[in-house]
């Protein structure tokens, strides 16, 4: 009897992706800052010069834009209940300069005090914090979320 030999397995061979392709794959999922994109490429074993060249090329072609990234972060974090101080600090960690951060913060169309009030109403109900310990708790919570003193006072009814 002839035993049939199993056919050799045909595995797909994937070409090694170029640094530009890898960077584009990251950008397709979500926006990235230049610093963040460069860091992720380096973490994936791409040479520093090749990573920088890929980021420069994608920036030049319009695939990567720090202003667009910053505006998306502001919109996302403000919608998630974070205040301007928290958002500014986060944008700073992404390697954006103060001018880019200010421009991104200017894209916010809402009112920070109203955002703080909405958060307080969701957390404490429509009546808001009633007694002093609740007001302190609410103020501390808003401060941890990055709201400034004026917004906190207005939201917790410290203003007369």
From Swiss-Prot:
Protein name per the record: Regulatory protein RecX
Family of the protein in this entry: Belongs to the RecX family.
Keyword Cytoplasm part of the UniProt annotation: yes
Summary of the function given for this chain in its UniProt record: Modulates RecA activity.
GO cellular component: cytoplasm
Gene Ontology biological process terms in this record: regulation of DNA repair
HAMAP family documented for this protein: RecX
Subcellular location: Cytoplasm
Cytoplasm is among the record's keywords: yes
PANTHER family: REGULATORY PROTEIN RECX FAMILY PROTEIN (PTHR33602:SF1)
Record's keyword terms, sorted: Cytoplasm
């Amino acid at each position: 009897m002839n035993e049939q030999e199993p056919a050799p397995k045909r595995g797909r061979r994937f070409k090694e992706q170029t640094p530009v392709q890898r960077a584009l794959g990251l950008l397709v999922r979500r926006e990235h800052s230049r610093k963040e994109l460069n860091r992720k490429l380096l973490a994936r074993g791409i040479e520093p010069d090749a990573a920088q060249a890929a980021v420069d090329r994608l920036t030049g072609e319009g695939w990567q834009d720090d202003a667009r990234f910053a505006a998306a972060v502001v919109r996302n974090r403000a919608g998630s209940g974070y205040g301007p101080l928290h958002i500014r600090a986060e944008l700073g960690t992404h390697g954006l300069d103060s001018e880019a951060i200010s421009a991104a913060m200017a894209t916010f169309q809402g009112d920070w005090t109203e955002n703080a009030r909405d958060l307080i109403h969701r957390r404490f109900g429509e009546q808001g914090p009633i007694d002093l310990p609740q007001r302190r708790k609410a103020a501390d919570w808003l401060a941890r979320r990055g709201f400034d003193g004026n917004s906190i006072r207005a939201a917790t009814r410290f203003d007369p």
